[in-house]
């Protein structure tokens, strides 16, 4: 659906042990391959590969790279996550290298937007992701996780099905009012 590949820092940008940089899109594997010491082309989905981010043959950081192949990913696109050391400098440098090699900086919420537009999650689940990020207590987090699991959709599904049947019947009556075998709507 999308013809570009996006990248962003997925963890808070602060000094810490680990930072994660996420890349999603058709060219995710190719772009990460351009800066990674190992070839991900033939690696299995949901695998982790140890290696180095390199620039001009010199190591930039020691990393673990997680590979998730479409469609079994959050965005339903190929997704690669680089787990690097958590300093702000090295995290930004790796992101910059990805952008220089063809990725585009993701907008805030764009990974979830792609998950929604690619049919991975529905609107209530997309909203719940933000609710989870903003949750400040157990009750709010619990409500958000139930929404992410699709409990609202499951609750509403019988009503949605009934409405879809009603719409179909109305459309048949509009399109074929002269046929006797079509149940008349009043």
Regions found by a protein language model. Give the residues of each.
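A glycine-rich (often HGG/GG-containing) alpha/beta subdomain
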Residues: 1-142, 146, 150
């Amino acid at each position: 659906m999308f013809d570009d590949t996006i990248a962003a820092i997925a963890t808070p940008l602060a000094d810490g042990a680990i930072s994660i940089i996420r890349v999603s899109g058709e060219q995710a594997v190719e772009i990460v391959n351009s800066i990674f010491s190992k070839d991900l082309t033939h690696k299995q989905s949901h695998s982790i590969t140890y290696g180095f981010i390199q620039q001009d043959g010199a190591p930039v950081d020691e990393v673990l790279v997680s590979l998730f192949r479409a469609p079994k990913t959050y965005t339903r696109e190929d997704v690669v996550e680089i787990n690097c050391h958590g300093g702000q400098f090295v995290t930004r440098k790796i992101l910059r290298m990805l952008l220089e090699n063809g990725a585009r900086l993701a907008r805030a919420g764009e990974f979830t937007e792609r998950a929604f537009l690619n049919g991975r999650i529905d609107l209530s689940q997309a909203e719940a992701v933000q609710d989870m990020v903003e949750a400040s207590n157990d009750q709010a987090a619990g409500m958000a996780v139930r929404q992410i699991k699709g409990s609202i959709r499951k609750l509403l599904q019988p009503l949605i099905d009934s409405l879809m049947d009603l719409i179909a019947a109305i459309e048949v009556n509009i399109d074929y009012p002269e046929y006797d075998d079509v149940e008349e709507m009043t």
